[in-house]
Amino acid sequence: MPPKKQQEVVKVQWGRPGNNLKTGIVGMPNVGKSTFFRAITKSVLGNPANYPYATIDPEEAKVAVPDERFDWLCEAYKPKSRVPAFLTVFDIAGLTKGASTGVGLGNAFLSHVRAVDAIYQVVRAFDDAEIIHVEGDVDPIRDLSIIVDELLIKDAEFVEKHLEGLRKITSRGANTLEMKAKKEEQAIIEKVYQYLTETKQPIRKGDWSNREVEIINSLYLLTAKPVIYLVNMSERDFLRQKNKYLPKIKKWIDENSPGDTLIPMSVAFEERLTNFTEEEAIEECKKLNTKSMLPKIIVTGYNALNLINYFTCGEDEVRSWTIRKGTKAPQAAGVIHTDFEKAFVVGEIMHYQDLFDYKTENACRAAGKYLTKGKEYVMESGDIAHWKAGKR
């Protein structure tokens, strides 16, 4: 008798559950954060002032997630309404050295970082005497180190306070199931505190078990959030694809935050493109033999949150719905309306690639590509769904 196949252990995902997740734009003052926010949202919110705290309260915007599949479906169905997937982006006030102790807008800044689920970290890699750097000169490695150090200090302080509370509870000695759970939590958080204070590495870089990740997720630690590094160069450097700071920044990320994404870009160039129509912007990029990095930045942020999308399609509307990786069919249906989840019967599912290949829904059915899926079906990015629900 052949040995039983071991069931694959599903890795617990970092971060909050749910699909309404947010990215925050983080960096030192005057590195291009607010200008980047204005470019990514194509909104005119007034020029950011040339001083450290131009953005006192976080600005929020929803940006459409570029998706060629969605564009094709809209062309195929020609619907009256087209609703893409969206990514929520916050512009957060600049961090300064000492933020963890309340310097500048430190406490407000760190609370805003805690409220987001992923980070776009804008790193200044351009020289400009007219744009003051809060530290006096341009040094991307120093800036990177300041930010990670401030986040690590705040995480360690938060974990230490949490541990103090747990120790008081577990010292009472009661041998209940609740107490056993608290002792397990304490042991994990002791390990987390040791990791933060001894390795000086972001918590997301540690090797953690599923149970440990669950406990860490409950703490909303700053260094548990995925980070995408946006290296803001001058337009000249971006167009010639050469920058004196870039190799040093890449080396720092490889050594201190291995595996994190680095995207070279020019905020000045991206902002200039927003002054054009779409056709003019495309023509300008062709003329300069380059392209906007905003689509890549948005998609990378969306993916960093472990988000995927599925579609509902018809003559009235083509819509992209955001869900987390690993979402099952009833919960995916529930994103449209909670009744669809509660009274879920089945989903009729075909995949975008099959519709693209076979061209019509009828051809997909004839080829056996339009399938009925039940409650245990795990959604895939690019699924096209028609939900059937019963009476509650």
From Swiss-Prot:
It is found in: Cytoplasm; Nucleus. ATP binds at N30, V31, G32, K33, S34, T35, M233. GO terms for molecular function: ATP binding; ATP hydrolysis activity; GTP binding; metal ion binding; ribosomal large subunit binding. InterPro entries: ATPase_YchF/OLA1, Beta-grasp_dom_sf, G_OBG, GTP-bd, P-loop_NTPase, TGS, TGS-like, TGS-like_dom_sf. Its cofactor is Mg(2+). Mg(2+) binds at S34, T55. The keyword Zinc-finger does not apply. It comes from the Eukaryota. One of its GO terms (cellular component) is nucleus. Residues 306-389 form the TGS domain. Pfam families: MMR_HSR1, YchF-GTPase_C. Its main location: cytoplasm. Residues 21-285 form the OBG-type G domain. Keywords: ATP-binding, Cytoplasm, Hydrolase, Magnesium, Metal-binding, Nucleotide-binding, Nucleus. Monomer. HAMAP family: YchF_OLA1_ATPase. Hydrolyzes ATP, and can also hydrolyze GTP with lower efficiency. Has lower affinity for GTP. Negatively regulates the G2/M transition in the cell cycle. Belongs to the TRAFAC class OBG-HflX-like GTPase superfamily. OBG GTPase family. YchF/OLA1 subfamily. This is Obg-like ATPase 1. It comes from Schizosaccharomyces pombe (strain 972 / ATCC 24843) (Fission yeast).
